[in-house]
Amino acid sequence: MSNIDKEKAVAAALAQIEKSYGKGSVMKLGQRPNVDIESVSTGSLGLDIALGIGGVPKGRIIEIFGPESSGKTTLTLHLIAEAQKKGGTCAFIDAEHALDPAYAKKLGVNIDELIISQPDTGEQALEIADTLIRSGGIDMIIIDSVAALVPKSEIEGEMGDAQMASQARLMSQALRKLTASINRTNCITVFINQIRMKIGVMFGSPETTTGGNALKFYASVRIDIRRIGSIKDKEEVIGSQTKVKVVKNKVSPPFKTADFDIMYGSGISKEGEIIDLGVKLDIIEKSGSWFSYNSVRIGQGRENVKQYLKDNPKISNEIEKLVREKSSKVTNINFEQEEEVND
């Protein structure tokens, strides 16, 4: 078969597929209208840079996991706030029945516009998620958490009954069903997950996430979030130092990390990140405990500079813009980069 005959045969096959399944069901990759991946900011400047595309990708599955009280829900609430700022409609499937509306509001979430569901079973939660995603009107959906997606058979059974891998089977089936809808509707789907310990592990990390292996395969981005220290004002703890690691990334190079502060009652400290990244990129000068911008001293001590940037949003936005511009040109901004990861 000559090249011309091959081209004609392919064109005829493509026309037949489009006739059967609709226009856009098959195409050459270069013909796709959106080659660039759209994203939504995470609310953390450092994490946006670590993800490589300025946030989490649209139309993909995201998994955020970590130990208890590490900031998983805080990060997802910031994601919702950022999506709503862009005019997006968001939904929150609260399988843990633990969402605090007052805290969500403090983080910038418009709770009047947030769709919330508190399902009774894992099947109900995932069916609700599927219906919302298929509607095409939802820009972001959060499922909190995979561990709380309890199968109906387990809820209706007796305490102590052996339910062999029922949750893993449920997740595997649901993700097979959801993936195509998520991509077609461009909906960001975020699963919050918890960590468990594997018994009898001699080598490597004993940590694993709940719900089987399906989510690890289907997720385009997996973010590991950990609390690494406390922030104190004299003796009072006012926040936590947090480290995030992008352990899987299908849209940019993975294994990058970012550090930020989560302040109690107000969430991720944007000003703290601007200072740290500004110093790393030589936008802010640091001499001893003094910080300067454009050769003008802006404060002594990190907490004082954070307050200065809060009081002067124009300068804060100016430095943030410079950080984003400079970080896109610099391949290494002293972010740690891991070479391997344990599930």
Curated annotation (Swiss-Prot):
<dbReference type="GO" id="GO:0009432">
    <property type="term" value="P:SOS response"/>
</dbReference>
<dbReference type="InterPro" id="IPR020587">
    <property type="entry name" value="RecA_monomer-monomer_interface"/>
</dbReference>
<keyword id="KW-0234">DNA repair</keyword>
<dbReference type="GO" id="GO:0003697">
    <property type="term" value="F:single-stranded DNA binding"/>
</dbReference>
<dbReference type="GO" id="GO:0006310">
    <property type="term" value="P:DNA recombination"/>
</dbReference>
<dbReference type="GO" id="GO:0005524">
    <property type="term" value="F:ATP binding"/>
</dbReference>
<keyword id="KW-0238">DNA-binding</keyword>
<keyword id="KW-0067">ATP-binding</keyword>
<keyword id="KW-0547">Nucleotide-binding</keyword>
<dbReference type="GO" id="GO:0003684">
    <property type="term" value="F:damaged DNA binding"/>
</dbReference>
<keyword id="KW-0227">DNA damage</keyword>
<dbReference type="GO" id="GO:0005829">
    <property type="term" value="C:cytosol"/>
</dbReference>
<comment type="function">
    <text>Can catalyze the hydrolysis of ATP in the presence of single-stranded DNA, the ATP-dependent uptake of single-stranded DNA by duplex DNA, and the ATP-dependent hybridization of homologous single-stranded DNAs. It interacts with LexA causing its activation and leading to its autocatalytic cleavage.</text>
</comment>
<keyword id="KW-0963">Cytoplasm</keyword>
<dbReference type="InterPro" id="IPR023400">
    <property type="entry name" value="RecA_C_sf"/>
</dbReference>
<dbReference type="InterPro" id="IPR003593">
    <property type="entry name" value="AAA+_ATPase"/>
</dbReference>
<feature type="binding site">
    <location>
        <begin position="66"/>
        <end position="73"/>
    </location>
    <ligand>
        <name>ATP</name>
    </ligand>
</feature>
<dbReference type="InterPro" id="IPR049261">
    <property type="entry name" value="RecA-like_C"/>
</dbReference>
<protein>
    <recommendedName>
        <fullName>Protein RecA</fullName>
    </recommendedName>
</protein>
<keyword id="KW-0233">DNA recombination</keyword>
<dbReference type="GO" id="GO:0006281">
    <property type="term" value="P:DNA repair"/>
</dbReference>
<dbReference type="Pfam" id="PF21096">
    <property type="entry name" value="RecA_C"/>
</dbReference>
<dbReference type="InterPro" id="IPR020588">
    <property type="entry name" value="RecA_ATP-bd"/>
</dbReference>
<dbReference type="Pfam" id="PF00154">
    <property type="entry name" value="RecA"/>
</dbReference>
<dbReference type="InterPro" id="IPR020584">
    <property type="entry name" value="DNA_recomb/repair_RecA_CS"/>
</dbReference>
<dbReference type="InterPro" id="IPR049428">
    <property type="entry name" value="RecA-like_N"/>
</dbReference>
<comment type="similarity">
    <text>Belongs to the RecA family.</text>
</comment>
<dbReference type="InterPro" id="IPR027417">
    <property type="entry name" value="P-loop_NTPase"/>
</dbReference>
<dbReference type="GO" id="GO:0016887">
    <property type="term" value="F:ATP hydrolysis activity"/>
</dbReference>
<dbReference type="GO" id="GO:0140664">
    <property type="term" value="F:ATP-dependent DNA damage sensor activity"/>
</dbReference>
<dbReference type="InterPro" id="IPR013765">
    <property type="entry name" value="DNA_recomb/repair_RecA"/>
</dbReference>
<keyword id="KW-0742">SOS response</keyword>
